[in-house]
Amino acid sequence: MHRNISVFTILLGFLLSACAEANTSSFSISSNGSSTLSESSNDLSSSILSSGMNESCETIVPSSSNARMSTRALETQPNQSSLESWFDETKSNKINPTIDLSTTTLTSQERVDLDLAAINYTLGMSLPSTGTNRSAFTWDSSHPDIISAKGAYINLKPGDEPVDITLTVTAKHGSITGTREFVVNVQPTPEQVLSRSDLLPFVNTSEEYLVVDQENIPVYFTDTGTIPYMDVATFMEMVDGAVDFEILTFTEEEDILTVAYTLEDEDENLEPIFYEYEAILDFELNTFSVEDFSFFGNYVKSTETDFSDGLVFLGGIGNNAELVTIPLNDYRIDLVRHNGEYMMPISILNLLFLNAIYYDVYYNGDKIYGFDTFTALDSTSPVLTEMKTSSFNLESMSLDLRQSTYHFLALAFDYFYGLKDDKNIVSFYDYLEEYADKILTGLDRNLYSGLFGFAYGLDDLHTWHEATGFYEPTSYTIPLTSLSQLGRQTQNYYQGRWAVEDLMEAAYGVNANGSPINPPALRLMDDDQIAVIFIRGFTVDTPNEVKSILCSLPETVESVVMDISYNGGGNVGAVLRLFGYMTEENIQFSSMNPVDGSAATYFYDSTYAAFDYDWYVMTSSITFSAANLMASMAKEMGVATIIGTQSSGGAASIGLFVTPDGTMLLRSTLNVFANVTVDENGNRTYTSVEPGVPVDYTLTNPFDNAAITNLINQIRSERS
């Protein structure tokens, strides 16, 4: 039923339903978030507080339960049936006021006093902006980095000193204001004690990794917490098939757990060489240490698809990594020893041990799922719906889960995001401040909205919000509906994309759905001396498709243009394999890791037979990601001449983060594509290709065959 709120307020006034409280209250917050209240300071207007209330703070109901309103409003507005029906005793939806409201009036001072008295603060609550009696609230916090002016509570680190925080609320009605203070004693996050357990099924959904479904996986919780923990070795054994569990060793020394493995290879003389990798988890100091981030990727099992078909790895050369110790304590993550086992939150196990192998674990409260990243990239996949379907879909998130998600984001992006330095971010806690209120207060959809904004706020085309978590129905999504939701760099990319599509439409027309018709896969020009091969994106099949075109070219062709002007990227392995058709020389690929400081150039031979042509790579402002890499490699190796306009970058490969609430975020990984220069002393300097690849010759319209012909003839003339 529609109700006119202003009229309703005039007619009914208000019902007093809050207990009288002191004007200043002191809280002591214990480790589990409970609070104790001690009264102090001044009583508010006792006459007002007692009106309509008994000693138990219950509403006093007048003896007449069918009191009628006598008001000119109903007499002068007889057609307002929605109002009349409230007081029609013959109708079932009538309201029986508990007070004779026709005689109740409140001054602004009384409204302010009542609304201040009615506030019942609990740690982590969203701070109200209005009172029942229409006073407007504004809040101030003495430590907004711990409790914000909207109530976002960022728990202290274990070992921190307790902090007294003063929250001051100012209420205003008309010209009258009043204040009330809450003194909150916030304690550091305590050590976690696991006291509950559950047995959950594990379901593998990946077709790339052969992981076995399992029953009765043990998961542990604190007494009142909702964060699931698992033993490290049990977790790794659960995903055997995605990881090679047999090569892993787990060495236990009191509070130290060492996870290690050894790989064997051969040198140029076919002599065996061994590479040793280890990670050290200190359960006393709550730290995770690794000497080389390649630890995370070399225990991976082979996928069903051969993404390196035709490539022979020859070795690499580069800069050594530096030891990285992650202070998990700073991110409120507690490593727990329990019954002789070494426990970590599932979300952190997934982040640390699986982030580099494109296989992830998803906990939804009822089951544990294993899936590959390619599944997450398909928003229409039934696997996503299956994983998100949970008995928690209609539940509300707990405070500890919200806090866990908040701290997870800081950890994940501080240590596993490849463009942190490019974004000039020192700590992601600084970046998160803007989103703290949404993530930590309000409805669950506030959190999902906050994570959505967090991802797109980075203005990184390789970082986006893929799916909401499991605390909402599976149908719930947050759509991108406007460019205003995106950052400046991303907006520029899409503006450039539309400009390229306009050129494409002018040359080839539009489809029935209004999208531009793509160029043909092969364009021949200049009396069949020039061939342009249009590559829309890179998939596993792209090298074979290009080979078929190359084999079909007439003998008159001298120059071949790889047109990646409308190519947004794809599979990096396909790019490397494609060079096998463009050069007989070794294929050179460089990358860098901005966290451990490592950088390397890798060399591959190809079993493919190269075609002897005058090669060109044509780019535009929307040539991105793996396509950007192709242009960079072609230029660095001297395989092709770059024509068109400068590419848009996209230096890092993409990977997935699964937050504790189940949200999926794609992001730029630590595998950052780079160019390398070597000085006279053999020192190697690596530079990210994130800014894009400058062209050798400018061509503004990649679909203008005459312009392409003229430019290539010009280049030929300059060479002769």
What do these predicted regions represent?
Residues 264-560, 564-568, 713, 717:
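Flexible, low-complexity junctional segments that flank or bridge functional domains
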Residues 15-18:
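C-terminal motif of bacterial Sec signal peptides marking the signal peptidase cleavage site
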Residues 27-94, 99:
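Post-signal peptide N-terminal segment of mature Sec-exported envelope proteins
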Residues 215-251, 332-348, 353-364:
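Extracytoplasmic Gram-positive cell-surface binding/anchoring modules and repeats
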Residues 65, 70, 76-192:
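Beta-rich interaction/scaffold domains
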Residues 1-5:
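Positively charged n-region of N-terminal signal peptides that target proteins for export
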Residues 375-394, 406, 530-532, 539, ...:
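C-terminal "post-core" interaction segments
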Residues 20-22:
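Bacterial signal peptide processing site
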